[in-house]
Structures are given as structure tokens and as C-alpha cells.
Amino acid sequence: MAAPGSARRPLLLLLLLLLLGLMHCASAAMFMVKNGNGTACIMANFSAAFSVNYDTKSGPKNMTFDLPSDATVVLNRSSCGKENTSDPSLVIAFGRGHTLTLNFTRNATRYSVQLMSFVYNLSDTHLFPNASSKEIKTVESITDIRADIDKKYRCVSGTQVHMNNVTVTLHDATIQAYLSNSSFSRGETRCEQDRPSPTTAPPAPPSPSPSPVPKSPSVDKYNVSGTNGTCLLASMGLQLNLTYERKDNTTVTRLLNINPNKTSASGSCGAHLVTLELHSEGTTVLLFQFGMNASSSRFFLQGIQLNTILPDARDPAFKAANGSLRALQATVGNSYKCNAEEHVRVTKAFSVNIFKVWVQAFKVEGGQFGSVEECLLDENSMLIPIAVGGALAGLVLIVLIAYLVGRKRSHAGYQTI
């Protein structure tokens, strides 16, 4: 008779194999893009989880799934990029027409995954059962995945990227672009999520009286240049409008001005994306992204991303991003100008107030602003005095006509003696 323990061994072995299989499905995978010489220029090792909200005939539904182990790099769509022409990109395909794309860019000191996009096919009944639409959807967003040049980006914690109704979470991520030797660098830039939490501060003193509303921010000039010259000119004053929960559980809204005297600017020039990155007072990073619509030949503010520290907040690290904006639009080669204050809503909790903006992206001739395209707010403000002036002129004319008619009638009433 077999020993009692020996009967359990096949069952335990089967359970172990199933567990290893499940772990394998969720394990990190390596993706690589090589140039024509066979040298890797992009390496990425991560696992990814997707959360997608979509519509069914019975109502909204949420589907979560992992990047499968058989996901592959799309070689004919991935690229090491060409200087001043195109940026590096990694395109990963899986399932029935689903792709995850990481678009990279760099400046003199740092590189980043500037834009992440996800294309998903709702006709895939395995991932999206009972979907009311069979369309192929595309979503995209800027990210805070960035690292120093010649260092790898490392993030063991989950890195979330929100794209409208889709959230992509990268786990145990090691990513590096602009490689020269087909291997990850020893040096690394760690994500904020992996950094040690700050020491717990003592209880905050009683809240002071509300601080006064700051005056309008100072206007400063910014420019971004590449090897082909200037790709961005901007003159503007910037004010952050933040809503957050404080440590005492109260919700406050604060206005913070960007002080040009305590701000450094950098950026990058790409064929389809231009960025302006502002570092202010050692606690705030504000990123602007300008895109271009090739069919209409117009540029626009496409994305804004903010990372800042709010000492009195329950969560001092404040982050917000939106890569689907359509603001500050003008024809490529022209400049966009608005003297009126503009409010650009990024998220429910964050917006940017822009004062006296004058901006031009992509095509900048001779480092000077091109022909001006006025904003609607300025055009309306010009129409108001014209309308008021016209109304006053009409009123004066009516009074004058009434006076002349009255005078004529009074003369007609006299009799000659």
C-alpha cells in the first residue's frame, strides 16, 4: 500500500505547476527595439495590467486583463528615431489588434516616455464580451516616466497612466531609451513611488486665516531650440489652481503663481510633439506639450502635466495630467495671442490660469513670432467697445433728429404780423 503522503504528491505538484503558470502570466517581459546595425536603442522590461470601461447593451462594463506573455514588438512600427525627424517608439501588439505604444523624447539631460497610447479592438469578444460597439478605439496620455540620460528608469511599484476610460498600470518596470550598447545602464532613476516616505511630521498647528489671493503672475519668455533652430516661443504668466484635501480633512483651493525668477526651463523639439518643461522653486515640475494636426496644419496645446509638493495636504505629492487638451490653437507658422486670462482645465482638481499668452510652436522663422491669430476672448472684448460706441452714436443721432424735427415744428407754428 502506498504511503498516505505519496498520494498527495501528484496533487501538490499539479497545484505548484498551476501556481507557476499563473505567476508566469503576470511576470515581467522584455521588449527590445534595434537599429539597422542590430544594436538595441530601446529596452523595456515590465508587466502591464489594463482596466477598460466600455459600453454594452445592458450598460457600462469594466474589464481588467494583463498583458499576455505572447505580446510581441511590432518591428515595422517601432523605431529608434531619426534626429530632428522622428522620435523613438516602442509598439507592442497582442490579441486581436491591440497595441500599446511608448513614444520617447529627450533633452540635454533627461529622456521620457512622453506619450503612451493604447489601441484596442472592441470586436474582440474574449476581452470585451457583449460590447455594443465593434470599433477600434485609441486613447493616449502624457506620462511621468522619465530618467536621466544614460540611466535606466526603475519602478517596482505600480506606475499608472490614465487615458480617458482606460488605465494602464506598469509593474516592476525597467525602461531605457537612447541606448548605445544593447544593455541597461548600471545607474538608475527611481520613480517617486519607490522612494522612502518622508518622516511623519508633528501635528500641524491650528490653521491660519486664509491667505490672500495672489496678484496676477509675472509674464516671462520661454523658448525651446533643437539642432534645426527654435521650435517653441512663448510669453506668458502662469498660475496654478489646485483643489486638495488638507491634513485636517478640510478641502481647500489654492492659487499658486509660477515665479519666473525661481524657475528654470528646458524642453525638446520633435517632428510631431514639442515640450516645455518648467522646474520651479525645487518643488514643482510643470510640463506643456504641443501637438500638431497635419491635415489642418494647426498646432495646439495637447497636454499638461504637474508634479508638485503641498506641505499641508494629506498627500503632499500632488500629481495631475491630461494629454487630450485642445487649447491655444493656431496655424503652423503663425502665433497664438490672448491678452485675456485663459483657464485651461486639466483635471477636476487642477487647472492652469494663463495670463497674456503669446505662443508659437513647431515652425518659428528667425526666432521671431509670426502673424498673430487673436483668441476669441480678445475679439469679443474688442467688439464690446465697438458695439457700445455704435449704440452711443445711434443715440446721439436720434436725439439730433428729434431736436431738428422739434425745431422745425416750432418755427412752423409762428404767424407773421
UniProtKB/Swiss-Prot annotation:
Region spans: Hinge: 195-227
Disordered: annotated span: 184-221
Location of the region described as Second lumenal domain in the Swiss-Prot/TrEMBL record: 228-382
Compartment annotation: Lysosome membrane; Endosome membrane; Late endosome membrane; Cell membrane
Glycosylation site list: 37, 45, 62, 76, 84, 103, 107, 121, 130, 165, 181, 197, 199-200, 207, 209, 211, 223, 228, 241, 249, 261, 293, 322
GO biological process: establishment of protein localization to organelle; Golgi to lysosome transport; granzyme-mediated programmed cell death signaling pathway; lysosomal lumen acidification; positive regulation of natural killer cell degranulation; positive regulation of natural killer cell mediated cytotoxicity; protein stabilization; regulation of organelle transport along microtubule
Disulfide cysteine pairs (residue numbers): 41-80, 155-191, 231-269, 338-375
Compositionally biased spans, kind Pro residues: 199-215
Region (First lumenal domain): 29-194
Annotated TM spans: 383-410
InterPro entries, per the entry: Lamp2-like_luminal (IPR048528), Lamp2-like_TM (IPR048524), LAMP_CS (IPR018134), Lysosome-assoc_membr_glycop (IPR002000)
Membrane topology reported for the UniProt record: Single-pass type I membrane protein
Principal location listed in the UniProt entry: membrane
Cytoplasmic side: 411-417
Coiled coil: none
An example Gene Ontology CC term for this record: membrane
A Gene Ontology molecular function term of the record: enzyme binding
Post-translational modification: O- and N-glycosylated; some of the 18 N-linked glycans are polylactosaminoglycans.
Regions of this protein lying in the Lumenal compartment: 29-382
Signal peptide span: 1-28
Known role: Lysosomal membrane glycoprotein which plays an important role in lysosome biogenesis, lysosomal pH regulation, autophagy and cholesterol homeostasis. Acts as an important regulator of lysosomal lumen pH regulation by acting as a direct inhibitor of the proton channel TMEM175, facilitating lysosomal acidification for optimal hydrolase activity. Also plays an important role in NK-cells cytotoxicity. Mechanistically, participates in cytotoxic granule movement to the cell surface and perforin trafficking to the lytic granule.
Family designation: Belongs to the LAMP family.
Quaternary assembly: Interacts with ABCB9; this interaction strongly stabilizes ABCB9 and protects ABCB9 against lysosomal degradation. Interacts with FURIN. Interacts with TMEM175; inhibiting the proton channel activity of TMEM175. (Microbial infection) Interacts with Lassa virus protein glycoprotein.
Protein name listed in UniProt: Lysosome-associated membrane glycoprotein 1
Record organism: Homo sapiens
Classification of source organism: Eukaryota, Metazoa, Chordata, Craniata, Vertebrata
Gene: LAMP1
